[in-house]
A protein has these predicted regions:
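Well-ordered beta-strand scaffold positions
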Residues: 42, 67, 75-77
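Histidine-centered metal-chelating micro-motifs
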Residues: 49-51, 69, 85, 89-95
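Short acidic-glycine-tyrosine-enriched beta hairpin
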Residues: 75-89
Length: 115
């Protein structure tokens, strides 16, 4: 069992090529007893974005706060607090903060997707 606040977890700069103003926090994973998946919180600063990329696993996202877009295979979808997004395997994607406050979102991936 595990109970905690995501704000208490260390922030890790996302330094991949194509990222700007992006950090992640690994909140739930094997250390908390979830062996097969990882729940991360991604924060994008104003004008920040995650790298455009693809991979062979899907992921699920939920927007905690802020506004922006998720790009999936060249299609732009607006996101705001309360928006869910499912990104299928092998679809090119990224998140972009289009608002005037940080964009915070939950990102759930299989364990192999946490690098």
């Amino acid at each position: 069992m595990f109970v905690g606040k995501y704000k208490d977890f260390p922030k890790i700069d996302m330094t991949q090529s194509g990222a700007k103003g992006a950090v992640k926090q690994v909140v739930v994973g094997p250390e908390q007893g979830w062996e097969d998946y990882v729940l991360r919180v991604i924060t994008l600063d104003v004008d920040g974005y995650s790298p455009t990329h693809t991979h062979d696993w899907p992921h699920i996202n939920y927007v905690i706060s802020g506004t922006g877009v998720v790009m999936i295979s060249g299609q732009e979808y607006p996101v705001e607090q309360g928006t869910c997004a499912y990104v299928p395997s092998n679809e090119e994607h990224c998140f972009i903060n289009k608002g005037d406050v940080p964009l915070e979102l939950i990102c759930i991936v299989p364990l192999r997707g946490e690098a």
